[in-house]
């Protein structure tokens, strides 16, 4: 998994970006007796950069319903040629 630009989740560089879709990446690691266990326990939390669609109010909002599904689908489309990971409708990452 490659995550890009985690430090710029919301910034004032664009007052109304055409694409307000974004996501929070969440990774969990399991240690047993100090040993890292194999497997991926990761998800994305689909979000929008703004709480309104007409302009950027700089209030990131967790997406839900159809918007969340749309963001997950876009992430799958962006990743299909370079990854064996698929994101389900709830944001959970699965290795194919």
Predicted regions and their residues:
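Conserved beta-sheet core of the metallophosphoesterase superfamily
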Residues: 1-25
């Amino acid at each position: 998994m490659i995550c890009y630009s985690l430090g710029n989740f919301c910034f004032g560089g664009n007052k109304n970006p055409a694409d307000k879709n974004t996501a929070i990446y969440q990774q969990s690691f399991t240690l047993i007796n100090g040993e890292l266990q194999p497997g991926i326990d990761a998800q994305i939390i689909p979000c929008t950069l703004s709480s309104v669609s007409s302009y950027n109010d700089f209030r990131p909002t967790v997406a839900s319903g159809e918007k969340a599904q749309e963001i997950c689908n876009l992430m799958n489309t962006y990743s299909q040629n370079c990854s064996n990971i698929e994101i389900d409708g709830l944001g959970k990452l699965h290795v194919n």
